[in-house]
Amino acid sequence: MRNVRVVAIQMQCAKDVATNIQTAERLVRQAAEQGAQIILLPELFERPYFCQERQYDYYQHAQSVAENTAIQHFKVIAKELQVVLPISFYEKDGNVLYNSIAVIDADGEVLGVYRKTHIPDDHYYQEKFYFTPGNTGFKVWDTRYAKIGIGICWDQWFPETARCLALNGAELLFYPTAIGSEPILDTDSCGHWQRTMQGHAAANIVPVIAANRYGLEEVTPSEENGGQSSSLDFYGSSFMTDETGAILEQAERQAEAVLLATYDLDKGASERLNWGLFRDRRPEMYQRITD
């Protein structure tokens, strides 16, 4: 029996990078005290969700893995606490900018980087202004405690993401996220968001862990953003499922949270074999997906 203790962290993001890193560290330490071995923080937690507006100055936030403050900080924390930490960050690689994850193993070493594949472009979720679509493909990391696959926010809406990660051997699926109110559509997408990922877990027989931010984030009108006045209310509701998609743990909409679940990885592997979903696949019939 291979058990792994996993945490999803839900936090509010302040305007100051140092404050957000301190908050994240406090919650990571709290998770480690509860026995967590793999800890997921939300998407782009270093700052407010800057993609709500378009400002050329924000390109300066992008950094390489070696330069990024959060990555370098949490390499030390991961080694001290012996935990795996996927860290979301705004990546600069030469002249190209990405929305990325650096996976830090429990020895403090960076195993590699995943770059977000699907880049949204909607009212106040204006990510195409800041990010180039990722070129890494869907990657799975063999960490000290489990083989983990990671998609970033909008990736979670695409079943292809989860299926590719499962085919690549992921035992757990992680989705760091920044999602909240819809500025144009008169809808609360929270339930839809959760059910989409529950379906990925059920269809692949792999647990899903989703970590979101929470709180109201407002944009102040300025000459640089064309006088935009707007706000997004991030609805939290981070959650963790089992391999059938059933929700094991869920956070409130507007509160800090450290969600903890224990997964039996051998049980998950056995269930995937028993159900035969991967045995009975017919890839030769799926050409329409890539047309």
What are these regions (language model features)?
Residues M1-I38, F174:
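N-terminal active-site segment of His-dependent metallophosphoesterases
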Residues N3-C13, S100, V140, A146-D155, ...:
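Active-site-proximal beta-strand elements of phosphoester/diester hydrolases
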Residues V6, V103-L111, T241-L248:
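Short, glycine-anchored, charge-dense loop/turn motifs used at functional sites
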Residues V17, R26-V113, I179-V206:
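Cys-nucleophile CN-hydrolase/nitrilase-fold catalytic domain and related Cys-dependent amidase chemistry
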Residues A66-P86, K147, C153-A257:
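CN hydrolase (nitrilase-like) catalytic-core segments centered on the catalytic cysteine
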Residues S100, V113-R115, Y175, Q250-E252, ...:
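Residue-level detector of high-confidence beta-strand sites
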Residues K116-Y130, A255-L273:
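A short, polar/charged loop-to-alpha-helix boundary motif
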Residues F138-N168, G268-D291:
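Cysteine/selenocysteine-centered motifs that mediate thiol-based redox chemistry or coordinate metal-sulfur cofactors
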